[in-house]
Amino acid sequence: MNIVLAMAQGLVVMLVAPFFSGLARVIRAKMHNRRGPSILQDYRDLAKLMARPESVSSDSSFVLRIMPPLFLAVSFMLAMGLPMFTLQSPMPVFGDAITIMYALALSRFFFALSGVDSSNAYAGFGGIRELLMSVLIEPSMLIALFTVAIVCGSTDIATMGQHIVTGNVSSVVAVILAGVAFAAACYMELGKLPFDQAEAEQELQEGPLAELSGPSLAMMKLAMGMKQVVVVAWFTSIFIPWGEPATIGVTALVSAVVFLVKCLVDFVVCGVLENSVSRSRFKVLGNQTWAVVGIAVLAFVFVVVGV
């Protein structure tokens, strides 16, 4: 039953990822007073890319070729492990905070490395920026997760959500502050404005994706959309776990609808925020991200002093 639910979660995330990326395009168009594409346009784009031939630079190595399937596999694996439809993780080995951090770091490393490997100047700069973003994002994520892990007594995402939904936490203030910091870090991880530095359209022309085409580009776009859904699910599983049944069963079908509604609300909020700001200068990103680190550290201090 667990493996069936895990596969179902992965397939649902794969199916809805283009919908949520299309939703972001629709919100951008409406806020820019344009008609914009259909909300289903990303599905059509993926179908077109899958039908096109693929061209690979003769200067690139195997890294560029294995990166799209690796990125897709990591996103699917994390979707299988997170407690999306119930308060229990279908595959706890993939639902641990440390495992998730390392898996995201692995996909990010190969994503950046493929940009450098492609011998394209834009892709190389995009890869370097991707690594810089990881340095700026991961400290706040780690500190916020470590704070909640101390409060809940476990690094398992399902256990964290169960403690929070029942109110069985030793420091409510610390959990709230950690949630604020983690929400901000997740927003940065989504690559929304002003933090879309690696694929900055006006500057780097899609960055590490510049040398991909055909099925590889389709696979990569799908994987990046899945990663966004996984990151949103990661946040909701810990800090907004309400509406999910405690056990795996038929009620998981209703919970799947609740999960999709949560994701819809989160993506709408992120879409509005993204189109309400402009892209930050690359050199001042650190000034913005360190504020999030400060909030996460403050949450940890509250746990230490017992507030």
Regions found by a protein language model. Give the residues of each.
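Alpha-helical transmembrane segments
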Residues: 6-17, 92-105, 167-188, 252-255
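Membrane-interface amphipathic/juxtamembrane segments adjacent to transmembrane helices
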Residues: 24-53
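Cytosolic juxtamembrane amphipathic/interface segments immediately preceding
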Residues: 45-63, 121-125, 208, 212-216
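Transmembrane alpha-helix boundary signature
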Residues: 54-57, 76-91, 111-120, 150, ...
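Mid-bilayer segments of alpha-helical transmembrane spans in multi-pass integral membrane proteins
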Residues: 80, 99-114, 135-148, 152
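Juxtamembrane/interfacial segments at transmembrane-helix boundaries in multi-pass membrane proteins
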Residues: 90-93, 148-175
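Interfacial loop-to-transmembrane junctions
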Residues: 269-296
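Juxtamembrane boundary at the C-terminal end of a transmembrane helix
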Residues: 299-307
